[in-house]
Structure formats: C-alpha cells, structure tokens
Amino acid sequence: MEQKMIAAAHFKNWLLEKKMIPVYLEVVNQFVRNELNYYVIEYMVAGSELLIGVAGGYEEGAIEHCGHVHSKMELLMEGNEIEQAEALVDEIEGFWSSHAAVVEQIFRENAEEGRFVGHLLLASHEWDADSLCLELAERWNIQVESELSGTALNFNVDDMQVEISLYEGQMEHHAAQIHAASNIDWPEVLDVVNYHQAYLKVMVRSGASRLEAGKLHVKVMSCLSMQDNVLAVDAAGTIFEPGLYDEYSDLMKDGSFPLYNMIHFGFYRTSKGLSGYTYGLKMFGELEIEVLDTLGETEDLHEFLSTLVYSVLSGQIELKNGNKISLAEGHELMVSEGMSEALNEITVKVEYPD
C-alpha cells in the first residue's frame, strides 16, 4: 500500500475518533519536513465545505507516523494548502514542546530534591494494596508496616519514605504520550497509553543513598507492574511494557543495579553518524552522558553507554570536563561538557573508540 493511502487511512481514523464521519477525503499534496513525509488532506463532513488537514510525518517507506495528524476544520485555500498544512504541524509541535518542557521541569525538580517518581498506567481506577505488600515481602523481603488511607499508601524502609497515590483520569501535561514517543520498540505503545483511565504515582524520597532509593523505587514499581489492570509503566522518561519492566528488575536478585529500569538510552542518526544519550542519570546527581557522531552500530553504542553508566554509578570513573578516561588498557577517551545536541541541558560528552 502506498504511503499516501496509509496517511489517508490514518487521517480518517483520526476523524472517526473525534466522532466526525468524512463524506469525502483525498490526499491532494505532500511535502518533506525534517526528512519526514507529510500529506495534505482535503475532506468534507456532512454540511461542510472543503476542509484541510495533515497527516505525518512518515520516514521513507514507513507505515507509522510521528503523531502529526491534525485539522482545525479550516476551509482549504486552493494554491495555499501546503502553507496551511505546515501551520498545522507548527501548532502540533508547539503544543507538544510546551508540555514536554513542563514534564522535563518536573523531572528536574524531583531530581534536585532526591525524589524518585514513576507511574503505573491503569485500565481502571483501582489497585490492590494488599497484593503489593505481599509481593514486597515475598520477592524483596520488605515488610510494610502501614495501612491504606483511602487510595494512598505511605510507608518507610530504613531512612527512605515511599508514597503511593491513585489518580483518576490520564496523566497531566500529556506526560505519558510524550514519554511514549521514546519507545520505538513497542509499536502499540501510543494506543495503550491513550487508553489509560487512571494512574498510580510512586514516589521514593531518598535517604543517605540515592542508589538505594533508586533500587527501592524499582522494587515497588516492579511489584505493582504485574497487577491485573496495569497497562504500562512510565519511568525514566519512557514507557515500558509491564512484563519487561518486571523482568529488568530481576537483575537486583543477584546484586546487580537495575540499569534498564532507571536509565533510558536514546539513539538517533544524522548525516554525521549515530549518536546516543542517557536519560535518568540526573536522578543520581550526575550529568547525562552523550556520545556523538559515531560510525558504530546501535547495539555497540548501547553497550558503550551502559558501561559508562555502570562505571559512573559504581564510582570507577569520574566524567569531568577535560578529563581522559580509560575503559580499556591503552585507550584513553576525552571527556568534555557542553550543551546537548538532543536534550535541553548541559551533558558530558565522551569520545567514542571508533
């Protein structure tokens, strides 16, 4: 099926979700923006004149879009349809950019205060506190000495405080949808996220050790992730399938750090090569790590970033501007600091051993 036919189908589904039934719909033009294909749609609903919409962006040959499907039910201006469609894309990008900035600010504030925060997206406004307490005792030998207060549960573990709260409706600022965009390995992630009707917020306030607080947070989240009405797990700036999040947490059973529960690794390609970055290190008082313009493959860069994170959190290396580090004998790598290429913050950039 041609990509433009897929775009037309996506736009039709978008209309139907908004309870609008098109009586006419056609792709009339297309344009490229940021190396993505966009399709201009003209359509009519009952009683309307010709209206304009847009569907995109699609990578070349792809069948999934990046979420830019939109219309304001404005009249199509013949000869000016591309400018109208680009204005719709501008509006979408501005909307998501403003919400993403709020979500990121909340994350930074939590990091500065030593608060680990994650969410469980729920199919219904309910959860089982008794089941959580049993799971914590059986799996992690954590005894919860507290009672449920309404829909909230608070308890202490050593010098750390755990707070669990149930909220009706979807997460504020479209945070779940924003985080869903970073999970390219789960094709249905956005559909799942859009379905959630309630959510649990899990917060752990750090004591003397942020590492221990992070581990405790993962233990609580992993136990909750397997409750029947959990659709997805929102943590480390991305969305996890519940079973995968729980599987990653099992690393702690042999004393390992639950790296993939707590740190998200992002990758992107440009004409200069493959780049990657971390998201979540700031929770431990560290700058995020970035590696730019490599000639390697994603799997190799992922392994390299993982090694760096383990080494930083275990205290084996210190990433400071101007330092040289050695991960392998006889091979020194330069470290620098500067504004991120992918994140709106200062990161440490580490030379890649191409």
Language model: regions and residue ranges:
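Short Lys/Arg-enriched alpha/beta "domain-start" segment
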Residues: 1-29, 115-135
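Mixed-charge, low-complexity intrinsically disordered regions
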Residues: 8-99
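Structural alpha-beta junctions
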Residues: 61-62, 138-146, 220-234, 313-319
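N-terminal low-complexity, intrinsically disordered segments
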Residues: 122-190
